[in-house]
Amino acid sequence: MTAEQLSKLWAFARGDIAETTFENWFLAQDELEAPLGEDLHWSLASADYRDRDVVWKLRKSLAQHLRAHEKCECASIRDLAAIPMGGDGLDERVFATIENVRDHGGGLWWLHLSKCSECGQHWMIAQEERIFDEYFLRRISKGAAEGILSNTWPDEFITYERVLNIGHTFATPCVSMDAMSGSLIWSAEDLRKVRPEITVDEIARLLGVTPKNAKRLLQANGRQPPR
């Protein structure tokens, strides 16, 4: 199995390639039966890729087979992924080999460049521990990583508002026991500082609070909410 074939198989297993695109590619491949095994190979070759349940089972079976040969979690992580902090320990398994290379700094406390010590994969990471308690990871190329090391960062996580919007595509904000917690106050302040015209309703949605609470958070910072 070539590295390109392995990469394509993993892309399907983790959901980063369309079903029909993968089916057409797979049927054009030779010499995959031996590394995949007769049963799995036949399942992938003969499946109805229009059936979502079938596709889900295929992805799960393929991931289990491929994971047995991996020394890290990188190949199984989607190109854009959310890794919960704590919980079932996925974050510990992922970050057992992913090491910090560069912090953005300059007030962007959440943004980092990291690299896997096993496979060499680079990741741009937004560590969001105020609202979602998630790590958001973007798989990036070696060229993009070199650009970051030259202080040219991609825009995807470059503002806190963008990070929170990405968070909403994966989960709902954590419910804070303290409606006026420091993390909420600081987050509202960060959002307003970067985009002064942001509305109370927008801040409320991003932080997972009511508009009334969002207004109080801004007032706690000495900010006057827009009318």
PLM feature spans:
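Short functional micro-motifs and their immediate structural scaffolds
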Residues: 79, 121-124
